[in-house]
Amino acid sequence: LHMLEDAGAECIVIPCNTAHYWFDDLQNVAKARMISILDATLGDIPPSARYVGLLATNATLATGLYQKKALARGLTLIQPEDAGQALVMQAIYTLKRGDKTAAQALLLPQIDSLIARGAQAIIMGCTEIPLIVAGHERAIACPMIDSTASLVRAAIRWYESWPDTRASLTGEQRLTA
């Protein structure tokens, strides 16, 4: 963290959901602005969605990171049941081995299960999950919230609001989120 700040970083993002277990501790000692993937993701939940599915690693679920912040926003999180969570993890590992088709066969039924249990939106709370879902978004009956994309949009908003950036960009040069 301090190496980034010493190199001139004025904003730091951590593109890993599970690593946000340490976010508050890091933020407490950081001089640079830090953007939370959790806050960015939850901020992208459609206002009409009160019941939100969560697909994430076992570690992210066990830490309760999303659960605590979602509850504070009045959201109810729906997680896969134990057998379904085992398949989510298997899908992640299968993708890492390079077999996207097999990973989709494992993960897509878990998405259907969350929707059947009332999910009005689903958080893809692991950076591999959007890679598995890619190409199937239109067939899914609710919004899929990509935590990495949410973090990127939040970082772009920070960048565009930074005084040095505002002064140097014209309207056409501004990034849109």
What residue ranges belong to the model's regions?
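Non-catalytic structural scaffold of enzyme domains
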Residues: 1-177
